[in-house]
Regions:
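Domain-scale recognition of functional cores that engage charged ligands
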Residues: 1-242
């Protein structure tokens, strides 16, 4: 699927590179790194396996495969695209931390604060929810994926009630780490769009994603969903820059 598509694209872009597909569960580890079938070792990997799950992976003999993999990376036995540091951004409470620091007016520069104010919905830790004003808030699991367990709640004083919930058809197929905490964001009403998909014309909502390389924007992606809370039902939308 996605992994093989990326492999083929890399082969096209870098035909001189020896690019191979290897399932994480077929991977072997030795003191030198990750051995391949011809006796060589992998020097650069593109990781798609979710980091929050990888760290707990074990072999059939109950050896800590994930920990051994990360130890080898720390020893510079191989390099990684999408490295372990990415786990910081995968935890949704990171947005709560950024917004909390923004509110102090002591941590970010003026340009940083302008970017946060424009692009980050006000975000809060679970422990701060009781002190927020009454209104609508989005509740998200900190390790949630594909809209799983996303709810919109109506806060009334010290209590809250369900206003909207994301119902996921393929709940059991969504692989993610169990979350013991949630975070909250202000509910911001989205604009509605009409889009033609494979089954006809639908009314729904757009989600834009910006991919960064360092501090530079490298690409923009767009998804369309008939639902306000997008999940696996969303369609990828082609973008045209005029």
């Amino acid at each position: 699927g996605t992994t093989q598509f990326l492999m083929n694209e890399l082969k096209s872009a870098c035909p001189e590179a020896d690019t191979r597909f290897l399932s994480f569960y077929d991977m072997k580890i030795d003191d030198e790194g990750i051995p391949l079938a011809d006796g060589s070792h992998a020097t650069l990997l593109y990781r798609l396996h979710p980091m929050e799950l990888l760290i707990d992976e074990q072999t059939p003999d109950n050896e800590p495969l994930g920990e051994m993999f990360l130890d080898l990376y720390e020893e510079n036995r191989f390099a990684l695209f999408n490295p372990p540091e990415a786990i910081i951004l995968q935890n949704k409470s990171f947005m709560s931390l950024v917004y909390a620091l923004y509110l102090t007016d002591q941590f970010f520069t003026k340009p940083d604060r302008d970017i946060i104010e424009r692009y980050l919905a006000p975000s809060y830790f679970e422990n701060d929810f009781s002190s927020l004003d009454d209104g609508l808030y989005i509740q998200k699991e900190i390790w949630g994926r594909e809209g799983r367990h996303v709810q919109v709640v109506q806060k009334h004083g010290d209590t809250s009630e369900l206003y909207m919930e994301k119902l996921v058809d393929n709940y059991d197929d969504i692989i993610c780490r169990d979350s013991k905490k949630v975070m909250y964001q202000d509910f911001i009403q989205q604009k509605r769009f009409t889009h033609t998909v494979d089954c006809g014309v639908k009314d729904g909502f757009l989600t834009l994603s910006c991919f960064m390389l360092g501090d530079q924007a490298s690409a923009v992606g767009c998804r369309f969903s008939p639902e306000e809370i997008a999940g696996t039902e969303a369609y990828f939308v082609p973008l045209l820059i005029e």
